[in-house]
Design a protein with these regions (language model features):
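Sec-dependent N-terminal signal peptides
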Residues: 4-14
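A short, N-terminal "cap"/entry segment at the start of jelly-roll beta-barrel domains
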Residues: 16-78, 161
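Short beta-strand segments in beta-sandwich/barrel cores
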Residues: 90-93
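Short acidic-glycine-tyrosine-enriched beta hairpin
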Residues: 98, 102-135
Length: 162
């Protein structure tokens, strides 16, 4: 009886331990983007870390502002395409090929990262450019000089029908 009672009381704990979902955010005025960039810049801990701020959010989708000042590891987003718009700066987007030194995804993440990327096609990106990374495709932002700020949206792709 005691075991049953303890099990019943502990059963909700994994649910309680989950992070709270972000509240829906339907609009961010363009005038607020410089403040989001400043916040991302202040939050950045290292040039190899991508600082992220939410522009808009309707689960399961987030429109993110990503702030980078250096090379970050290449990645593959399993089952997700990625739409990119360059807000500020320039970089080379390497797309395709394969990851080297693959690291398994973090728990709950659809993204794998690696230590390098081989066989990718380079595409220069500058302010105002758009790019789309297909699902399950290796990619990396390279040749970042100064600040590189993008808007990105990961798009969950429907399963292919055979």
């Amino acid at each position: 009886m005691n075991r049953f009672l303890i099990a019943a009381l502990l059963a909700p704990l994994p649910v309680l331990a989950q992070p709270a979902p972000q509240p829906m955010k339907l609009f961010t005025p363009g005038a607020d983007i410089p403040a989001l960039i400043a916040k991302a810049k202040a939050d950045q801990k290292s040039p190899t870390i991508n600082s992220v701020e939410t522009i808009a959010n309707v689960a399961p989708y987030q429109v993110l502002l990503e702030y980078r000042t250096g090379l970050t590891p290449p990645s593959v987003h399993r089952g997700q395409a990625e739409l990119v718009y360059v807000i500020q700066g320039s970089a080379t987007l390497a797309v395709g090929g394969h990851l080297t030194g693959v690291q398994p995804p973090r728990p709950g993440s659809a993204s794998e990262s690696g230590s390098g990327i081989e066989g990718a096609t380079p595409q220069k990106l500058t302010q105002g450019d758009y790019a789309m990374v297909p699902p399950d495709t290796a990619h990396q932002f390279q040749d970042i000089k100064g600040e590189f700020v993008i808007m990105s949206v990961h798009l969950i792709m429907p399963e292919a029908k055979n």
